[in-house]
Curated annotation (Swiss-Prot):
The chain crosses the membrane at residues 1-21, 465-485, 586-606. The keyword Membrane applies. Pfam families: Zn_dep_PLPC. This is Uncharacterized protein YJL132W. PANTHER family: GLYCOSYLPHOSPHATIDYLINOSITOL PHOSPHOLIPASE D, PHOSPHATIDYLINOSITOL-GLYCAN-SPECIFIC PHOSPHOLIPASE D.
Length: 750
C-alpha cells in the first residue's frame, strides 16, 4: 500500500471514531515520549498533567484556527527561548522571590508547564533539521534525501504522522502493557492558573482580546484528544499501520532511534543535559542574557558530545545476576545504553582479561566500563554488586588495537571526530580530524594488516562525513601510529593529516549527496597477501570491494556487490548509480563479517530490513556468491522485519555462524546459529542457493527477559569472550520505562 493510502487509512479511521483532527496532532505522542525522557523525577509523580500540556503548548495554536495569523505567529514565538525567558521572569516575580510561595501548587504547576514547553523546543530543532550550520544533516533532511527522493514536505509529513506510530511501537510491545497505555491515553492534561498563563502571554505580546484562556484551553485539549485517539487507533490497527510504514520506509525507525542529529539517542542526551540547566533558572532571582544564550544553545546544538570531554577515572556500581544458563550484567542506571559496543583485551597492569563495554548515554557524555572477566566466574555462583572503574567519555564504539603483544583500548568519540588510545587505563594518544569543518561522526571502524609488516593498520570512517554526507573511509598505517604508542610517557594529540601514508577513500568515482559511503567496513579473513576490503555505500545499496594491493586516494573498487549480484569493475559502466530508498535495498551491507574455515575465506553481508544474509566466497582475489540465508518464522506481518543479520559472528570452536535478530518475537530479540556443515552442503548444491532459517533447526536463544517494556535491541552487538563464552549487548534495555531505570542497558553472558 502506498504512503498516501496509509495516511488515507489514518484519516478515515480518525473520522469514523470521532477523532478531532489528524495533522494538527502530528508529533503530540512523540513530544509526550520525550517528556518522559527529560522531565525531572521530582515533578513526574504529581505534576504530569501540567508537564503534558506544556509539551504540546507550542503547537496548540498552529492548526486550531489556521487562518488566525496572530495565533500562528505567537505559536512560532513559543518555539524559541525568548518566550521561556519571559515566562521564567514572571515566575520569579510571582513565586521565586517569596519563599512561602515557591513550593506551592501554583508555582510548581507553572514550573512543570514551562519545563514541558522547553522539552518541546529542544526536540523540534533537531527533529526538524533546524540546527544552525547543520541543516543538511538533521533527521528530517537525511530521511528526505535517502527515502523520499529529496521531497522534504513528504518526508516531513511522514515523520510527523507515521513517526507517532513508530514511537508507540517502540515503547509498547504488546496490548498488555497497560502502564504505558494509561500514560499516553489518560485525559489528565491541565494548564497553569489562568492569571499566570495569561499574564505571561500578554508579556510575550499577545493581548487578552486576541486569545482568551478558554480558547487556549480548547486548543491544548485538542492535542490531548489527538494523543488519546492515536493511542486507540494504534492499538486497534497496529499491524496494518506498521505494515504500511515499513513498506514505505523500512529504515525510518532506525533513523528515528539512532540518527546522530535528531535521533532519540541525541535528543535524550540533550534533554538530560539541558533540562537540569533550565531548572537552575528557577533558583536564580533574576534571568539574564547569558542564561538566555545558554537556552538558545541547548535548543540549537549538534550532539551534546560535540563538547570536548576530558576523560576521568570514576567508579560506578555494576550488578550481576545469574540465570539458568546465563549471567546478566548491568549498571542499573538510567540513561546509560550500557552494551552498545563490546571488546575484549588485557587493558590493565595485571595482564588479565577485561571486557570493555560502552555506555554512550551515561551522564550525557558517555562512559566506558572496564569489567574484569574474573568477576563473571563469581557471578555464576551468586548475584553480586561491586564498584567498577569506568572512564567518562563519549564512547559509542570501542575496539582493541593489538601491537607487539600489547592490547590498547580504542574509544571513538564521534561528536568530536576523535579516537582515543588507552594503555593500562591511561589515555596516551588521541587521533583527531580537523581537516574540514564538515568532518562529522568519524569513528573507529576496523584494524587490519595491509602492508604485511605485522603492525596493525587502523581504519576510521563516517558515512555522514562531508557537507552532503557523501562519507569517508580513512586508512592510517600502523607504522605511523606505533611510535606514538611506544613513547607513551607523554599524552599526545595528533591530527590525521600529519600521519605518513594516510589514504582517504570517498567512493570515487561516485560522489552522490547522501550516498553514505563508509557505513560499514570489513577486511577479508584470508591468508593471502592480497586482502579484500569491503565498504558499504548504504544509500546506494551497494558494497564496494577494494584490493589492499592497490590502495590510494583514487582507488576504484574491483567489485561492486548488490542484492542482485557481484559486478566486476569492468561492467560497472552499465550501472546507473543513484540514491535508492531502503524499501528497495533493505539496508544491504548494514553488517559485514568475514571468517576463514578450512582454508576457505567467507564473507557474510546482511540485509536486515529483508531478514536476509548473503554469503560470498573469496578465491584468489575473486568473489563468488555462495548462499543466501533467509529467516522464515511465523509473524503477524511479513512486512515488519525481524532485523535478521543485525550482528554476525563466527564461532571457530563450534564451527557455527551466529546471527542476531533484535526485532524478532515481538521485539524481544533472538540469536540464531547455522553450522558450517549445513552452509557448505546448501551452498555446494547447484539447485539450492537459499537456506531457510527456522525455529526448529536454527534458533539458539530468545532473549530470556519476558517482562521488559519496549524494544531492547537484543543482539545489537555480539563478541566471544574467554572460554568461548558468547557476550550479547542489550543497550536499550529499559526503553519502555517512563520513570525509573530508563535505557539502562545490559549485557548477557552465556
Amino acid at each position: 500500500m502506498s504512503i498516501i493510502s496509509s495516511w488515507l487509512l489514518v484519516s478515515i479511521i480518525c473520522l469514523t471514531t470521532s477523532i478531532v483532527t489528524k495533522l494538527q496532532a502530528a508529533g503530540v505522542t512523540t513530544h509526550l515520549f520525550y517528556l518522559t525522557r527529560g522531565a525531572p523525577l521530582s515533578l513526574k509523580e504529581n505534576y504530569y498533567p501540567w508537564l503534558k500540556a506544556g509539551s504540546f503548548f507550542p503547537d496548540a495554536l498552529y492548526s486550531c484556527a489556521p487562518s488566525n495569523k496572530d495565533w500562528s505567529d505567537f505559536a512560532e514565538f513559543t518555539h524559541w527561548p525568548n518566550f521561556l525567558m519571559i515566562a521564567v521572569s514572571y515566575w520569579q516575580q510571582k513565586y521565586g522571590q517569596n519563599d512561602r510561595l515557591r513550593g506551592t501548587h501554583g508555582s510548581l504547576a507553572l514550573k512543570s508547564f514551562l519545563i514541558g514547553v522547553f522539552t518541546h523546543q529542544i526536540v523540534d530543532v533537531s527533529w526538524h533539521s533546524l540546527v544552525t550550520d547543520y541543516r543538511m544533516h538533521g533527521l528530517l533532511r537525511v530521511l528526505s534525501e535517502t527515502e523520499f527522493d529529496g521531497d522534504i514536505e513528504t518526508a516531513h509529513t511522514f515523520l510527523d504522522v507515521m513517526g507517532e506510530f513508530l514511537t508507540l511501537n517502540n515503547v509498547i510491545r504488546d496490548s498488555n502493557n497497560n502502564e504505558n497505555w494509561d500514560f499516553l491515553t489518560r485525559s489528565d492534561w491541565k494548564l497553569p492558573r489562568e492569571e499566570d498563563l495569561m499574564e505571561i502571554i500578554r508579556n510575550a505580546g499577545l493581548s487578552k482580546e486576541k486569545l482568551s484562556y478558554a480558547e487556549l484551553e480548547f486548543c491544548v485539549k485538542r492535542g490531548m484528544a489527538a494523543a488519546i485517539s492515536e493511542g486507540y487507533l494504534f492499538r486497534s490497527q497496529r499491524n496494518q499501520l506498521l505494515t504500511n510504514i515499513y513498506s514505505t520506509s523500512p529504515r525510518a525507525n532506525d533513523l528515528i532511534l539512532n540518527h546522530w542529529l535528531g535521533g532519540q539517542s541525541n535528543l535524550v542526551a540533550m534533554l538530560q543535559r539541558c533540562v537540569p540547566f533550565f531548572e537552575t533558572l528557577f533558583h536564580d532571582e533574576n534571568t539574564n542574557e547569558a542564561q538566555a544564550e545558554e537556552l538558545r544553545l541547548c535548543a540549537n546544538l549538534p550532539p551534546v558530545s560535540q563538547k570536548r570531554i576530558n576523560a576521568r577515572p570514576l567508579v560506578s556500581s555494576l550488578k550481576a545476576r545469574k540465570g539458568n544458563s546465563h549471567i546478566v550484567v548491568s549498571p542499573m542506571k538510567s540513561f546509560s545504553d550500557f552494551g552498545t559496543s563490546l571488546t575484549m583485551g588485557k587493558f590493565r597492569e595485571d595482564n588479565k582479561d577485561y571486557l570493555a563495554v560502552s555506555a554512550p548515554l551515561e551522564d550525557t557524555v558517555g562512559a566506558i566500563y572496564i569489567v574484569p572477566w574474573d568477576i563473571l566466574t563469581v557471578a555464576r555462583k551468586e548475584d553480586f554488586s561491586i564498584l567498577q572503574p569506568i572512564t567518562a567519555m563519549y564512547g559509542s564504539k570501542v575496539g582493541t588495537y593489538k601491537a607487539s603483544d600489547v592490547d590498547y583500548l580504542l574509544v571513538s568519540q564521534p561528536g568530536t571526530c576523535t579516537i582515543d588510545f588507552y594503555f593500562k587505563g591511561v589515555k596516551i594518544l588521541t587521533i583527531k580530524d580537523e581537516t574540514t569543518e564538515e568532518a562529522h561522526q568519524l569513528q573507529f571502524a576496523v584494524t587490519g594488516n595491509f602492508y604485511d609488516d605485522k603492525i596493525p593498520d587502523l581504519v576510521v570512517s563516517s558515512p555522514s562525513y562531508g557537507a552532503n554526507e557523501t562519507g569517508i573511509a580513512t586508512f592510517i598505517p600502523g607504522s605511523s601510529i606505533i611510535s606514538y604508542l611506544t613513547n607513551s610517557d607523554k599524552y599526545q594529540v595528533v591530527d590525521i593529516s600529519t600521519f605518513k601514508g594516510v589514504i582517504n577513500l570517498d567512493g570515487y568515482p561516485m560522489k552522490i549527496p547522501f550516498q553514505h559511503f563508509g557505513a560499514t567496513i570489513q577486511i577479508s579473513d584470508t591468508t593471502d597477501k592480497q586482502k579484500l576490503i569491503y565498504i558499504t555505500c548504504q544509500s546506494l545499496g551497494t558494497v564496494f570491494v577494494y584490493s589492499s594491493n592497490d590502495l590510494h586516494d583514487l582507488s576504484i573498487p574491483i567489485y561492486y556487490i548488490t542484492k542482485n549480484g557481484v559486478i566486476p569493475a569492468k561492467d560497472s559502466d552499465h550501472v546507473e548509480w543513484h540514491i535508492i530508498p531502503s524499501k528497495e535495498h533493505g539496508m544491504f551491507g548494514a553488517a559485514i563479517y568475514s571468517w576463514n574455515f578450512e582454508g576457505m575465506s567467507f564473507v557474510a553481508v546482511s540485509q536486515p530490513m529483508f531478514d536476509t544474509v548473503f554469503i560470498y566466497i573469496e578465491k584468489s582475489g575473486q568473489i563468488e556468491f555462495f548462499l543466501k540465508l533467509v529467516l522464515k518464522i511465523k509473524t503477524k506481518s511479513d512486512s515488519i522485519p525481524d532485523e535478521f543479520g543485525s550482528s554476525l559472528l563466527f564461532n571457530d570452536e563450534e564451527k557455527k555462524l551466529y546471527v542476531s535478530s533484535p526485532g524478532s518475537f515481538d521485539a524481544r530479540g533472538s540469536i540464531w546459529k547455522i553450522s558450517m556443515d549445513e552452509l557448505l552442503k546448501a551452498g555446494n548444491d547447484p539447485k539450492r542457493k537459499t537456506l531457510l532459517i527456522n525455529n526448529l533447526r536454527h534458533l539458539m536463544l530468545i532473549n530470556p527477559d519476558k517482562s521488559s517494556k519496549g524494544v531492547s535491541n537484543f543482539g545489537n552487538s555480539m563478541i566471544l569472550g574467554p572460554q568461548n563464552h558468547l557476550i550479547v549487548g542489550i543497550p536499550q534495555y529499559g526503553y519502555g520505562n517512563f520513570d525509573h531505570m530508563q535505557l539502562t542497558g545490559r549485557i548477557l553472558v552465556l
